[in-house]
Amino acid sequence: MNNIIEINNLTKQYGSQIAVNNLSITVESGQIYGFLGRNGAGKTTTIRMLLGLIKPTKGNIKIFEKEFESNKTEILKNIGAMVETPGFYSNLTAKENLTINAKILGIQKENAIEEVLEIVGLASEKVKLFKNYSLGMKQRLGIARALLHNPELLILDEPTNGLDPIGIKEIRKLIKDLAQSRNITILISSHILSEIEQLVDKVGIIHNGVLLEEIMYEDLKKKNRQFISISVSDEEKVAYLLETNFGIYDYKIKENGEFKIYSHIDRQQEINRLLVLNNIDVFQMRVIEDNLETYFEDLVGGGTIG
C-alpha cells in the first residue's frame, strides 16, 4: 500500500512549551486512522500542521508521497478537512452555504452540492437555515463541505465532540460508508475511545505531545486480556494476600487503587472470600476484558481519556 501521510520527527514549540514532540506517524491508503488522546494532547496542533495552518518548528511531512512544504497548493487540493466546530452563515440554508464554498473552491461540477448533501443524509434538509440545524446536522454539513471537491484524504478533528449517542452513531456510520464506498483515506482525531475503536484500522495514541504507540487495531485486539477488576480498602495488604495465598504476581494497581488481576480468573469467589476473611472491604469485583479505553489508561499510567 502507498503511504498517504508520512510524518517524521514533527515538533511544534511555542516559546518554552512543546505542543508536539518529535512525532512520527504513517497512514496508508484506504485506512481509517484513529488519532487518539486527551484534550490538549497535541491532536489539533498536529492536524493544523498537516493542513498548513501552522508551521512546524522542525520535522518533515509528506502527503501523497510528496514533500508538503514544497507542494502545498497541489496537495491541499486533494484534502478535505473539518477542524473543530464547522463555521457557516447562520441565516443561510445548507445549500446556500455550500454554494458559497463551491465557488470559493472553484468547483464547476453541476450536481456536486446535491451529491454531497445526499452522501451525508441532508438532502431533505437542504433548505433549512443553518441556525436551525442540530449539532449533529451541523457536523454532517461540515463533512459535506469537506467532500465537495472529491478529496482523496479526509481529516476530521473531533467530529463526534458534543454529540448525543444518536448523533455519534450517525457520524460513525457516515465515516464507515465514506471509507468503503468512496475509498477515501481518513484520519480522525478523538478522545471518545469507545466510538473510535468501532471504526479504525490503525491507532496512534498521543499524550502530552508525544506519540506513545502506533498499532494496527487488529494487533491491539490480540493484546487484550480478561482480568478481575477489584476496588478495595487496603491495596498493600491485598497485594500481599494475593501473592502469598494464590501466587498471583500478574496484576496492576491503578492510581485510583483499582486492582487488575490477569491470572486466576476462574478463582474470583475464592479471592473475594480471602479478602473478606482478612477484613478487607471489597467495594467492587468483576471480570472485564481489555479494550481501547483500558489499553490507553495503561499506556498513560492513570485515569481515563476525557
Segments from the language model and where they lie:
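Generic structural signal for individual residues within well-ordered alpha-helical segments
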Residues: L76, L98, E114-L117, K169, ...
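ABC transporter nucleotide-binding domains
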Residues: I5, K12-I188, L193-H207, L211-E213
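ABC transporter nucleotide-binding domain
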Residues: R172-Y262
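Short, charged/small-residue-rich alpha-helical element at the C-terminal edge
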Residues: Q226-L299, G306
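Non-catalytic surface loops within mature trypsin-like serine protease
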Residues: S29, G106, S124, D234, ...
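ABC-family P-loop ATPase nucleotide-binding domain
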Residues: M1-T11, G302-G306
